[in-house]
Amino acid sequence: MSEEHPNATAYRRAADAFRVGDLRAIEDLVVQDVVWHVPGRHRWAGDIRGRDALLAWLRALAPIGFWLREHDVFGNDAHVCALSYMGARREGVDVETRVVSIFHFRSGRQVERWFFPEDAEAWDRIFDARE
């Protein structure tokens, strides 16, 4: 079995940091002008531009019970592909879907991310929290 590519390991470190609420660790794993493309018809869909905006977006996920679990992660010098389960558990909601995330990496840090959920309706329900 071959050793995991360092970019795949960097993605795993970011996912692990998210799970424990360590946004400072995530800050070190993304470039200043990072862009995440979040699909859907929910209020948080769209492009998230910049590290500060991304960290604020991630901070906002805690109250909606968002979670993620990797199935597999592949990487090379420029890209990472993460096959994951993502979902939310909160009062009245217990939903999940499989998601493919494609990342562009530069110098071991995330530059851009695209999410491709298998079930668009479930994906929207994950983020459809009423405040």
Regions found by a protein language model. Name each.
Residues 1-131:
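C-terminal and inter-domain tail/linker signature
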